[in-house]
Regions:
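Extracytoplasmic cell-surface/polysaccharide-interacting catalytic and binding patches
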Residues: 2-111, 115-217
Length: 217
């Protein structure tokens, strides 16, 4: 009688199996999704998004509101601009205060942008002019771009000066300040503001830190 040979299988622990699964997914979508790129993380209640902390293609905030349908103390470049409700409410308070201080004319030009829309923006932009899909803060619904009607740069206007002095009081930071591109990976954008909450924004305003520096990233 022939001797039966025992077959030995390879058993992996659930943790190792999960790591291998992520690695295979990363390879199938491109090495950048696994090697050298960390997943986006919450630091407390602050969401960090940049080239090293990306959002998935499926990520969509669950509380987006259309600014056009809400009470607003600002103008809009489009009737299809969305932000999370918390971000909108803080922004409305901020621009209402600006209006009471005779700082008028703010125009919100951009808010939430889906992963798929960011793919289009990235493909249509010159190299270095737009973030890669998943690396844009606009996908969080907590960032917006703003300007005013001017023949000068926004950073030369009184409205910009008011924001630089008061934005933190409403939970906003200028996300990509001048002379910090080596930290943020993004050149100066005086028009781009991000909601992080009053406490964090105030602390960053006092120290001059970027979000990466504040979070130790």
């Amino acid at each position: 009688m022939a001797k039966k040979t025992k077959r030995r299988g390879i058993f992996l622990s659930p943790a190792i199996a999960a790591v291998l699964a992520v690695a295979l997914i990363g390879v199938s979508f491109g090495a950048g999704w696994f090697f050298g790129v960390r997943s986006t993380q919450f630091h407390g209640d602050i969401l960090l998004v940049n080239e090293s902390h990306r959002l998935s293609a499926e990520y969509v905030p669950d509380d987006l509101v259309n600014l056009y349908t809400q009470r607003h103390s600002f103008r809009m470049a489009s009737s299809e601009i969305y932000l999370t409700r918390q971000t909108y409410e803080a922004m409305e308070k901020m621009f209402h205060a600006a209006e009471e201080a005779d700082m008028n004319g703010y125009i919100v030009t951009s808010g939430y942008r889906s992963y798929q829309r960011q793919q289009e923006v990235y493909a249509e932009s010159e190299p270095g002019k737009a973030q890669q899909p998943g690396a844009s803060e606009h996908q969080t619904g907590m960032a917006f771009d703003v300007t005013v009607e001017t023949n000068e740069g926004f950073e030369s206007t009184p409205q910009y000066g008011w924001l630089m002095t008061h934005a933190h009081e409403y939970g906003f930071i200028q996300r990509y300040p001048a002379n910090k591109a080596d930290v943020t990976g993004i050149s100066y954008e005086p028009w781009h503001y991000r909601y992080v909450g009053v406490d964090a924004a105030t602390r960053m305003h006092r120290t001059g830190q970027t979000l990466e520096e504040f979070l130790g990233q």
